[in-house]
Amino acid sequence: MGPICVKKHLAAYLPKHVSVVNGEWSVGHNTHNSPLTTHGAVSAAPYGSASILLISYGYIRMLGDEGVKAATEYAILNANYMRARLEGKYDILYTNKNGQCAHEFIVDLRPFKKSAEVEAEDVAKRLIDYGFHAPTMSFPVPGTIMIEPTESEDKAELDRFCDALLSIREEIKLIEEGKSDKKDNALKNAPHTQSVVTADEWKHSYSRQEAAFPLYYVTQNKFWPSVARVNNTHGDRNLICTCEPVESYMAAEA
C-alpha cells in the first residue's frame, strides 16, 4: 500500500519483483537470479498498488485547498471534543503542552488491568454491545485504544461514542469497588449475542438488560453481534482449516 523503509542489513530480506533488480528497472529480468533476492513478489506492482493513490488524489481534488483545510480542522476539533469529554475518566496519552491532541488520541486502559483485571480487549469487545466497532487497539501503545473520529461524524455520533465509553468506565468502577465480579461481568463476557441474551438459562451476576441494552439509545437501534467472545490469540497461533475434506468435494462433483 505504501513505502516500507528498512536499514541496509535487512534489504536482502525484502520482497522482490520480476521487473526490478536492486532498485533498478530491468524489464523481463528474473530477479530470482539476483544474489540478494530471497523472496518473490507480494504484489502485482513493484512498489505497491498505484491505484490506492487515486483515492487520496480524488479526495484532494474534490475538496480543493479550502475543503482539505476545513476537513482537517473539523477532524482535529472532533478529536479534541471527544478527548475533553473522556478526560478525567480515562488517561489520555501524548497531548501537547496545552493538553490537546491532533486528529486522533490514545486512551490508556492499562491501569484497569491492575485495578479491575480489565484489559483493552475487554473494552473493545464491550463496545460491540453498545453498537460500535472497536477503534485501533494496542497501537502504537499496548493496552490502549486509539480513537480517530475524522471530519465526517456529526456531534450526535461523537456523543454517542463518548457516552458508551463513559458507561463502560462506570462498569469498570463497579468491578474496582467490588460491586461486580472480576470474572463474571459484562466486560469479560462481551459481546453478548441475541441467542445468549434470550436463552432460557441465565447464570450471570448481572442482568440481561445490562448485557444487551446498557444505554437507552441501544434499545432504539440494537446491533446484534453474530458471535460471542472468541480467543483471538489462540486462533492466530493455531491455524486450523475448517473446510470439508477434499474427498467430499470430489464426491459432490461425481
Where on the chain are the PLM-derived regions?
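Active-site PLP attachment segment
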Residues: M1-S19
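PLP-dependent aminotransferase class I/II
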Residues: A44-I55
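Short alpha-helical interface patches
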Residues: Y13, N22, P111-K113
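Glycine-rich, flexible loop/turn motifs
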Residues: L10, L14, S43, H133
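Gly/Ser/Thr-rich helix-start
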Residues: P3, S49-S51, D65
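Non-catalytic terminal extensions of PLP-dependent enzymes
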Residues: V27-T38, V42, I60-A254
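Acidic, Ala/Val/Gly-enriched low-complexity intrinsically disordered segments
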Residues: V20-V27
